[in-house]
Amino acid sequence: MVYAHNLGFPRIGIKREMKKTVEAYWRGEISQQQLQQQAIELQLTNWKIQAEAGVDLIPVGDFSWYDHVLDMAVRVGAIPSRFKALNSNITDTMFCMARGQAPNGIETSACEMTKWFDTNYHYIVPEFTTNQSFELHHDDLFKSTKLALENNYRAKPVILGPLSFLWLGKCKGESFNKLLLLEKLLPVYAEIFEQLSSLGVEWVQVDEPILVLDLPPEWQQAFLTTYQQLNFFNLKCLLATYFGSLDDNLSLTCQLPVDGLHIDYCRAPDQLDSVLSQLPAEKILSVGIIDGRNIWCNDLNRSLTLLENIQSSLGDRLWVAPSCSLLHVPIDLDQENKLDVELKSWFAFAKQKVAEAAFLTRGLREGRESIGAELKKNEEVIISRKTSKRIHNPNVEKKAASVTERLMRRQHEHSIRKNKQTAQLNLPLFPTTTIGSFPQTSQIRCLRRDYKQGKIDDALYEEKIRQEIAEVIGIQVKLGLDVLVHGELERNDMVEYFGELLDGIAITSNGWVQSYGSRCVKPPIIFGDVSRERPMTLRWIEYAQSLTTKSVKGMLTGPVTILAWSFVRDDQPRSQTAKQIALALRDEVQDLERSGVRVIQIDEPAFRECLPLRKAAWQDYLEWAVKCFRLASCGVKDETQIHTHMCYSEFNDIIEAIAALDADVITIESSRSEMEILKSFEKFAYPNDIGPGIYDIHSPRIPRVAEIEELAVRALQYIPIERLWINPDCGLKTRNWEETKEALSRMVDAAKHLRKAFSSEKTPTIDLELQPAST
């Protein structure tokens, strides 16, 4: 029989219950027993939503208090030694690994965090050593599975596969071949399967998303040997791939001794024919035809026609599903009461997407007439979106068509610009700055909420925000920072803020998705041509600059990041949408410069995350991404200093594109990797200034001055003294004021020590070894 199933459901809860509960636990306001009870309630709610929608096989094990990769590391006992001695409690150990701090107050350096493939979700990077051991260490998956079965759900446990788990981890200390760990790891996977089998489970979903990457031959071979060795203890295995095409990994994937294969049709429709021709006759094919990464409702008529054709070949060996876990979309469109009615009709969130999968499955089982009403209603929605006049703006399209190469070049090269900027800004050696945002207190959030709800008027809101900006400027001046920021206190999110002010973009009220841990974001929805009617940031930056003689940065989010962190229209190339955003930002940059702002930061933390997973597609993306950044940034004089910021970026393979952005200063996240990221600059002479993140803002732990100095000295192995900036890893929005002021004070002290030690008149006197960071 054709089944409807799902690869994973959002964890955060319809009202973000997960976030509120886990943060209360971190603050010591609730017990661990209360934490676990909330986990049970959230999972039961998620399973009920899916079952009532008509999903046949319910994913179990997709819930996590922080991250599913972290959960897998803890489950198999891959707990770094620095955490083992700190906590006997496995839940607190997990939180300590993620945050560097456990609820009991114990601190140590957190595990590294990076992006999950090309999404805006972040995972905690497993750490492996040459003497790594594994053991079954956590029974969370078994408890959840048992709970689902006891509540009469047909449970399909979900786990990250062994090859993807190793690939996503990193060697700590001495480098070695991670595949050597399989011999110790596979018996633990076998234990997991044995226990799941003993519970009465029929199917298990094993996620191996790295099969859509360019894999080295030894990793391809490892798939064959690994899955031949794995003992599933009579469980049926659905091997799940997503985010791209199997391509050269298709043949080996079809050879694996598993019972079914899931493919991402939405991201890689061209692979379908090859999959159908190579799939062994006894295997299930799960077709991910509902887009798990975007919010547009499915064209059910078109999808059903495609699935009917597949069914004619596969019969009951066809399953229907979203393309990937629904972790990446909001939970329930029914919670949106303020969206324009026509716009809302075009959308589908997680609850609606599992219903779409169930509708299609029913159509395959019982015939089109069984879902005739749904098909008719859906057809009306599809036509409405295609013909709506609100999508196209002739003025925007004309402006985009008139863009020339000249608009994407600065007046002179960086060396000339730097001399002019140095004379104007009068900055010291090792200039200090922050990335942009400052702590968002409950008072600030309440102020913005009251303003949005109409409880306070424009005048009072502006007065209050100005008071907050003045306080932030005063704190920075007192701390001794060199280039200041206004704190972004008027912004709820670095992308949503601009989404609210740009035409062609809609904002939801409850469209939250998980970014990392308890951090949730509310991506804007780009539904039409994008344009700027009026200045978006000017009044706040002008006011902040009026309070100090030091430079205050204008703060903008770049075109690629706005694109990456939004749900984007799918009726034109993403590059075209990015160009429209870049033109709107260019107008804003020029307005800021005309007002006297001398430093303007255009954040592009998502620049690398948008990179296609397959290298063959890189060049096309990098060309248009670089052009869009330059289109936004190059309309200013030489004297205006352009900054950009990037997150979690491995630069080695795209360093030339980073340089091509031609930002005067780039700040990057690097502290968790202990400056390892700067190895990119060993062979490439990056010409502009760099500010490697000198302390980790994602952890509440405050670094010692000596630690900051040590990281700066490591950075000097790759960056000339006159080009090195001192700054945190990222914005400070999620930290509290006590942590922020103390950490920045230590950062400024470290910069002063460095200036003294590395002044041009004397030999460095700082008591640190000048050698590259260990890897």
Swiss-Prot record:
Keyword Amino-acid biosynthesis: yes
Record EC number: 2.1.1.14
Pathway(s): Amino-acid biosynthesis; L-methionine biosynthesis via de novo pathway; L-methionine from L-homocysteine (MetE route): step 1/1
Catalytic activity: 5-methyltetrahydropteroyltri-L-glutamate + L-homocysteine = tetrahydropteroyltri-L-glutamate + L-methionine
Coiled coil feature spans: none
Active site: H698
Protein name, UniProt field: 5-methyltetrahydropteroyltriglutamate--homocysteine methyltransferase
The species this protein was found in: Coxiella burnetii (strain RSA 331 / Henzerling II)
